[in-house]
């Protein structure tokens, strides 16, 4: 039986619940807006709830004040969420409960292998510590893979096939430095919040291959997935904080929203100057067509650092 702290009490109805879950490693940029807007429109078009979660579980990567700035940016662009913001930094007890349960069930083990060793064997962990019975000192925790996912269905892209070696890897769920791994925290929180569909960027397809097995280990219903196209800079790299993509403009949000809608293949108001942010979004929800969203990544120089 799962610990009650992180067990989600199943909802009595089948309401759609989506979410946007940024990490506070910097301000939102155009690529972030694509993910936020796509998930928002999908939720609102389904008469569902749209939640926001701040994934602040990796302090070394976080920028002071970025979380608050992200929330202000969402509001400035008219993307208003339902309920309270969930902060992963306040969910450590739930992650500990999840780790303890997996350990008690024999579904995880301690690993002392270094990155250098794993790189030396090709970059995919080989299960070296599975039967060595290490203790917790100076060790990471790995899942004992029971349900390798070699393919899954994406509602935009169809069946996505995964690298079999990657799918079978015993991946880390608690880091050697004591931080909770992204994949564990995301699954525990998405289940806790009752998320029924995850709409996010295509750069997160690989983590999906790791997250679905965690749902299955916990005995939870797996949500649906949609992976949106990525915005690229002229050099072909994903717009990201690491690549110094500029923050979303602080002025009139409407032209940026129109550009984001067009990026997603959606009908956009031709005379947007005559409409408010709220009216633009209302129209976008009414006319939202997932089938019109392109699958491929798209170069967008307008909001990349090439235009700065």
Swiss-Prot record:
First and last residue of the signal peptide: none
Motif mapping: 'HIGH' region: 22-32
GO biological process: glutamyl-tRNA aminoacylation; tRNA modification
Record note on cofactor: Binds 1 zinc ion per subunit.
GO molecular function: ATP binding; glutamate-tRNA ligase activity; zinc ion binding
Residues annotated as binding Zn(2+): 111, 113, 125, 129
InterPro entries named among the record's database cross-references: Glu-Q_tRNA(Asp)_Synthase, Glu/Gln-tRNA-synth, Glu/Gln-tRNA-synth_Ib_cat-dom, GluQ/Sye, Rossmann-like_a/b/a_fold
Binding site for ATP: 241
Any one cellular-component term (Gene Ontology): cytosol
Cofactor or coenzyme needed: Zn(2+)
Binding site for L-glutamate: 19-23, 55, 182, 200
Enzyme Commission number, as recorded: 6.1.1.-
Parts forming coiled coils: none
Motif window: 'KMSKS' region: 238-242
Pfam families: tRNA-synt_1c (PF00749)
UniProtKB keywords: Aminoacyl-tRNA synthetase, ATP-binding, Ligase, Metal-binding, Nucleotide-binding, Zinc
Domain of life of the native organism: Bacteria
Family stated for the protein in its record: Belongs to the class-I aminoacyl-tRNA synthetase family. GluQ subfamily.
Entries under NCBIfam families matching the protein: PRK05710.1-1, PRK05710.1-3, queuosine_YadB
Role: Catalyzes the tRNA-independent activation of glutamate in presence of ATP and the subsequent transfer of glutamate onto a tRNA(Asp). Glutamate is transferred on the 2-amino-5-(4,5-dihydroxy-2-cyclopenten-1-yl) moiety of the queuosine in the wobble position of the QUC anticodon.
Name under which the protein is recorded: Glutamyl-Q tRNA(Asp) synthetase
Originating species: Shigella flexneri
